[in-house]
Amino acid sequence: MNTETTSVRKFRSANIHIYGKCNYRCEHCFDRCLTKNYMRPSDWVDTLTFLKEYGVEKINLAGGEPTLYPFLDQMCYLVKGMGFKLSIVSNGSLITEDWMARMEGVVDWIGLSIDSIDEADEIQIGRGRGGHLENIVQVADMAHRHGIKVKLNITVVRRSWMKDFRPFIEKVRPERVKCFRALTLKNANDDVPDTWSITDKQFEDFRRRHEDIGCIVFEDNEDMVSSYVMFDPMGRWMVDSGYEKRFISFEVLRREGLDREVDVEKYFGRNAVYEW
């Protein structure tokens, strides 16, 4: 695959938020503003073709909760059939052994999301009603049995920044760990009281205590904004420059290019390209 050393730097991955609904109610979620409408897999062909011709290599299917999308299997087959590496970002609650078996050789990565290593925190945050952490370990085990790599996504929030995630990470055995600092975006999650934000010092303390884990990366708020190529469930280009979520038509993207809103240097700066 192409790496950061490529002479002309281009975005190598893109996130398609295929479905806006979710069965969890995480307090800090900045995707709850997504439209509840959605497109069929065939409607995504133009977007995927554009991304393929541009040089994108990996597609991340996200939500909402992508396993609620009624055409998930067909979408996975489409993306894989077009030659992309395929990742799915999920809360893991609806993933079964049967689905994993069907996706063996189709899905390359599964990203599993947590905010704390304390189940009481997860319940307070809105990530299910109990048993979330145990289920994440079980789903990770399923993935490994079927040859699917695991990425553990940790959102570092006010309830969890001081805790030690090492024992839980060892249980999950992920090939990659990504730690996000909880982010507030205008028009996304600024409509409710902020109970999740942490200070620079708190995030740095969390980083210092975990940075020697070999497969781990950290994304502060400034690393995140304007560094992701994203699409909403209706195929609109989703951008967050200036800490404000906005939606731009695909036609504008095709005419003006990804560089209009997304910073390729920030993309590479957050270690977005790795061995996938």
Curated annotation (Swiss-Prot):
Expression of pVip50 in E.coli (strain MG1655) confers resistance to phage P1; has no effect against T7. Catalyzes the conversion of cytosine triphosphate (CTP) to 3'-deoxy-3',4'-didehydro-CTP (ddhCTP), probably via a SAM-dependent radical mechanism. The modified nucleotide represses transcription from T7 RNA polymerase-directed genes (possibly by acting as chain terminators), strongly suggesting these nucleotides block viral polymerase transcription. How this protein allows bacteria to resist viruses that do not encode their own RNA polymerase (such as lambda, P1) is unknown. SMART domains: Elp3. Residues 6-216 form the Radical SAM core domain. Keywords: 4Fe-4S, Antiviral defense, Iron, Iron-sulfur, Lyase, Metal-binding, S-adenosyl-L-methionine. The lineage of its organism: Archaea, Methanobacteriati, Thermoplasmatota, Thermoplasmata. The keyword Oxidoreductase does not apply. Belongs to the radical SAM superfamily. Viperin family. PROSITE patterns: RADICAL_SAM (PS51918). [4Fe-4S] cluster binds at C22, C26, C29. It catalyses: CTP + AH2 + S-adenosyl-L-methionine = 3'-deoxy-3',4'-didehydro-CTP + 5'-deoxyadenosine + L-methionine + A + H2O + H(+). This is S-adenosylmethionine-dependent nucleotide dehydratase. InterPro entries: Aldolase_TIM, Elp3/MiaA/NifB-like_rSAM, RSAD2/Viperin_antiviral, rSAM. Pfam families: Radical_SAM.
